[in-house]
Amino acid sequence: MTPSEFRQSVRSGAFRQPTAGQCGPFAQANLAILPNAYAHDFLRFCQANPKACPLLGVGEPGAFRLDVLGEDLDIRTDVPSYNVYRDGRLTERVESLEALWRDDFVVFAIGCSFSFEDMLAREGIALRHIEEGRNVPMYRTSIPNRRAGIFGGQLVVSMRPLRGADAIRAVQITSRFPGVHGAPVHIGHPLELGIADLGTPDFGDAVTVRDGELPVFWACGVTPQTALMEAKLPLAIAHTPGYMLMTDITNASLAVF
């Protein structure tokens, strides 16, 4: 299935699941959508936190199509699930933004670690959340983001359990892709990130961590949602964690070496 065909399946309502493992060679994107009045500070926030918030594209006010991400792409309808935040609280999840869309909305598309999972799989590195048919586990850490204006919050990380040799190989592979979070930010000691229990992720689903495996943590594009919650904007929108926008950007094109 091509990315365009996948987006059509989302738009029609046929696909409403987490997007890990879909359209493997193509990049997926996190979304943050907010009024133009706050867009400059949010852009500075992303630039100040490039590990968690690597920008793939930024829209013009009111634009719901970003040609840099793909043809026949509609931000309002092509994500399986959206989070709606009002005054910093998650008030609803919706499957379309058509009724909520405003002419002053600015779209930020942020790289997603689902993008490099295809490369890991090609190297024989098994990914537990895909094996178990679950959403990837994500955790809010105790590490503060670099603040920009009203935006702060805490770093969010995704976790994949790997054996030692696979963890080393994963570092080597993902280091080539800083546009989709790059190398892990931590390996092995969740308490050092302020994570007390791997079995209770803040977002996504828990997965099995087997004896002899290390938890490997990558910066996560859900990080901006902690900033949106802390800023308490009257209205802001993001993807539901794990339910991403499929782009036409090839993962190979994002490699820096």
UniProtKB/Swiss-Prot annotation:
Q: Show the InterPro entries listed in the entry.
A: D-Glu_cyclase, Putative_hydro-lyase, UPF0317
Question: A GO molecular function for this record?
Answer: lyase activity
Name of the featured protein? Putative hydro-lyase Bamb_5282
Q: Which Gene3D superfamilies match?
A: PSTPO5379-like, PSTPO5379-like domain
UniProt family annotation: Belongs to the D-glutamate cyclase family.
Which species is this record about?
Burkholderia ambifaria (strain ATCC BAA-244 / DSM 16087 / CCUG 44356 / LMG 19182 / AMMD)
* Superkingdom: Bacteria
Alphabetical list of Pfam families matching this protein: D-Glu_cyclase
Keywords from UniProt, A to Z, are: Lyase
What Enzyme Commission number does this protein have?
4.2.1.-
EC class: lyase
Q: Sorted alphabetically, which NCBIfam families does this protein's record hold? A: PRK05463.1
Is Transferase set as a keyword in this record?
A: no
